[in-house]
């Protein structure tokens, strides 16, 4: 009986993934060729960043989990970093990190992921869209050097954010215990 329930859950999970994929494919069919090529470059660029900086991103992700940082804290730090530096390479590195979070959180946490990738962040990333498109259309060799610099910047920003948020919660806890 238990085995049948496990199979039911597996099929249920797979059907949900299938339907989500079909919906996404339907949205992709509505794109023109130019939009499809840009989307393809975004995919490739983000995958390149995630693959080459997997250890750094995983370390940043683990810090988020260890410190139990809320989605609103993550979102506010991402917005803050995009306000400080709005270069297309920073935007792409940020998007790559968000996509890594989405992969790790999976379907169960879709609403949490969408809280992070709010309209405000989408607006910040898509602002100056021509520069963003020009950046992802460059040759891969030109982009590599920018990714190294940007990933280091993003790593410092996220770790700084984590330290700041952790310090905030520690101070809050200490003040509560004192008073």
UniProtKB/Swiss-Prot annotation:
It is found in: Host mitochondrion; Host membrane. The keyword Transmembrane applies. Keywords: Host membrane, Host mitochondrion, Host-virus interaction, Inhibition of host apoptosis by viral BCL2-like protein, Membrane, Modulation of host cell apoptosis by virus, Transmembrane, Transmembrane helix. The lineage of its organism: Viruses, Varidnaviria, Bamfordvirae, Nucleocytoviricota, Pokkesviricetes. This is Apoptosis regulator DPV022. Plays a role in the inhibition of host apoptosis by sequestering and inactivating several proapoptotic BCL-2 proteins, including BAK1 and BAX. Prevents the conformational activation of both of them. One of its GO terms (biological process) is regulation of apoptotic process. The keyword Ion transport does not apply. It comes from Deerpox virus (strain Mule deer/United States/W-848-83/1983). Its main location: host cell.
């Amino acid at each position: 009986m238990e085995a049948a329930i496990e199979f039911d859950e597996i099929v249920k999970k797979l059907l949900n993934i299938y339907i989500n994929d079909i919906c996404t494919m339907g949205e992709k069919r509505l794109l023109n060729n130019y939009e499809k090529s840009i989307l393809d470059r975004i995919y490739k660029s983000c995958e390149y960043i995630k693959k080459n900086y997997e250890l750094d991103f995983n370390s940043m992700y683990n810090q988020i989990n260890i410190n139990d940082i809320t989605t609103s804290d993550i979102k506010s730090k991402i917005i803050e970093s995009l306000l400080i530096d709005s270069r297309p390479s920073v935007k792409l590195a940020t998007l790559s990190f968000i996509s890594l979070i989405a992969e790790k959180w999976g379907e169960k946490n879709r609403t949490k992921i969408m809280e992070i990738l709010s309209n405000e962040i989408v607006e910040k990333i898509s602002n100056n869209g021509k520069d963003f498109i020009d950046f992802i259309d460059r040759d891969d060799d030109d982009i590599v050097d920018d990714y190294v610099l940007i990933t280091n910047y993003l790593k410092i920003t996220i770790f700084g954010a984590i330290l700041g948020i952790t310090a905030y919660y520690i101070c809050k806890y200490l003040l509560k215990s004192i008073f």
